[in-house]
Amino acid sequence: MSQPRPLLSPPETEEQLLAQAQQLSGYTLGELAALAGLVTPENLKRDKGWIGVLLEIWLGASAGSKPEQDFAALGVELKTIPVDSLGRPLETTFVCVAPLTGNSGVTWETSHVRHKLKRVLWIPVEGERSIPLAKRRVGSPLLWSPNEEEDQQLREDWEELMDMIVLGQIERITARHGEYLQIRPKAANAKALTEAIGARGERILTLPRGFYLKKNFTSALLARHFLIQ
C-alpha cells in the first residue's frame, strides 16, 4: 500500500477531503509528522494546537486562525477530538471566541458559532496521557452537519448565554450554564483582559471567553455515528 501524502492545495470537494482524511486513519501522529517532515513534540504542554496543525497540513486546510472555516471553499470546519480507548471524548471542544460587546441584532442564524458548526469534519485521535504523543493513532473521520434537533439544542444554549452577555451578566456565567454549549474563559494568562458589558450597562474588563461544546454533546454524536456501546 502506498503511503499517503499531504495535500499541497486545499481540497476541491468534500469527497476529496473525506478520502484524504480516511487515508490517515490508523496512522500514528509520529508517523504522519515524519511523513510531513515535522518533529513530534514530547507532549502538548507548549504545543497545545500541534495535532490540529499537523492534520491541517495533511488535509490542505486554508484558514489558519482566520474566522472563516478551515476549508473555506467547502464551508467545512476541522475539529480534532481526543478520545479514550472506548472512543469517548476526553475534553470539551473549542468552537470560537465569544463576542462580549457589539451584539445588538445578532441572531443564531448569523452567529459565528452556527457558522463554525454548520459542517464539521470530526477526526478522533487517541488522547489518553498514558500513550506517548508520537504513538497516538488517528481514528476514522466523520463529516457532520447538525440535524434539526441538534441545531435547536445548540440554538437554545446560545440564546441563553448571549442573553446573559447582553444583560451584563458575563461574570455570572459558569461552565454549568447551557445543556450542550458552554462559555468559559479562553485566555492562557489572567492579564489578557477584554471589554464586556457590566451589570449596570457600563464597560468592564474581563477575561476573554470562548464557546465550547460539552462532552455530552460530542459523546452522543460520536456514539451515534460510530455505534459505540
Curated annotation (Swiss-Prot):
Domain of life the protein comes from: Bacteria
UniProt xrefs under Pfam families: MutH
InterPro entries associated with the record: DNA_mismatch_repair_MutH, DNA_rep_MutH/RE_typeII_Sau3AI, DNA_rep_MutH/T2_RE_sf, Restrct_endonuc-II-like
Single Gene Ontology BP annotation: DNA modification
SUPFAM superfamilies hit by this protein: Restriction endonuclease-like
Cellular compartment(s): Cytoplasm
GO MF terms, alphabetically ordered: DNA binding; endonuclease activity
Major localisation: cytoplasm
Gene Ontology, cellular component aspect: cytoplasm
Family, per entry: Belongs to the MutH family.
Name of the molecule in the record: DNA mismatch repair protein MutH
Gene this protein is translated from: mutH
